[in-house]
Amino acid sequence: MTLPLLVVLSLLNGCAEKEKFIVYGSTQNESEVETLIKEEDYVDRSTVIQYDDSMLVAVQIKPWEKWKKTKLEKKLQKKFEKKYPNKDVFVSADYKIFYEANKIKKDQMEDTKLSDKITELKELAKEET
């Protein structure tokens, strides 16, 4: 009797919603950024890294929207550039960039390494396109 209950509970726990929005670095406009991303229904998860005058927005697109990934990425890029004209904004829907951005957040990098890592991720994204 307890085994089926344990199985059901573990399945429900596995289906629990993970954190969908993560901001790392400067939190001065965290709620604005979160609102911008939540307005787009095609975004499944996102990680935003803000450092000085640059912002890296890594998103995961919902499965049925992946066919339009580049178009949606450009749309989000324009939206962020319009909202933050004085920041160097970079938006990517590439999973590798999303993974690395989450790794940066998890590792809690120091400022000197953070700047280098963001530059490295931008170069990686340009290579893949």
Where are the regions that the model predicts?
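Sec-dependent signal peptide recognition
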Residues: M1-L6
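C-terminal motif of bacterial Sec signal peptides marking the signal peptidase cleavage site
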Residues: L11-G14
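Bacterial signal peptide processing site
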Residues: A16-K18
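Catalytic cores of large soluble enzymes that bind and process phosphate-bearing ligands
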Residues: G25, K68, K113
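Short, non-transmembrane amphipathic alpha-helical segments
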Residues: E30-K38, K66-D88
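Post-signal-peptide N-terminal segment of Sec-exported extracytoplasmic proteins
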Residues: T35-T70
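C-terminal low-complexity, charged extensions that often adopt amphipathic alpha-helices
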Residues: Q77, E81-T129
